[in-house]
């Protein structure tokens, strides 16, 4: 696709992937100003890419294992190396919802020490000859991650996580399957853990289908399959929080309720947040024009991809000028623009407290460091 853009068969192309941005766009057409590049920060809900943990299956029926598992995955290393530092670590399950995203939640960092401390609480105290921890009864600390095999790069990425997890005493088994087979296994809740993401849309989080007990077990305690509660998670306190989120009558009520739901998801360590992008990067010929007004600069912020806004057009006069300049060897100034006016909309600093902090949910104070076994906000 980048070659089609380079020769002018495409007017515009999404080049968000690091290899496209850093390598494929280092071409004369960009350096000579014929093709422009732009980075646009959005406030669109982020897909919660991560590893979902099935609480109905060992070892993830133990909270300590789930928290240890979070500390055992070196996600930041993947971001720094595979994604060249361009992507960001996901924190809240509902990132990208503006004021409805709880900005106090921070993903648990990679830490062999903290991972082993949690695993020890779960009874995994004895190292095997290969370094994997086990219980006194011989049960090894092992877990399989199911994922679709349609992406070779994903298999390589998860393989790197597997290597670092061994330093924590955890054995990860990769379970790549055909996309249809993987989906069936996940929805039937036979997978121990699964790498995936749901697609979220504005205007606010709707977490009931993903975590309410009615989508996990029936009245007799039987596991309900083919629901979005792939963690098979059931908790009465969470049900109340989800009901409050669903039935909220005002934005303030919804904000308070959904922040508490997101905090509960984090406390219970139901998934391992992985990576996301806060921006979309585009390459486009200089004749493609975008809005530039007081109300809309480049693109409306609540759009996943500026190409889906349909607020852009071709300036035929500029196209004629560009093609003539290209034939004559004339160049223009290289253009690489960043539109970051909507960046950090999920941050603590972005919160509008002019009407009083009492309207915002109460949240726990998160220390910079401390006891890895410090109880969660919900435990306290």
Where are these regions (language model features)?
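Short, well-structured beta-strand/strand-turn elements
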Residues: 12-15, 125-127, 166-181
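Short, well-ordered beta-strand elements
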Residues: 12, 140-149, 172-175
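Short, hydrophobic beta-strand segments
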Residues: 51-54, 103, 138-148
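Conserved binding/catalytic microenvironments
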Residues: 60
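Detector for C-terminal structural segments
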Residues: 47-49, 68-106, 113-114, 153-163, ...
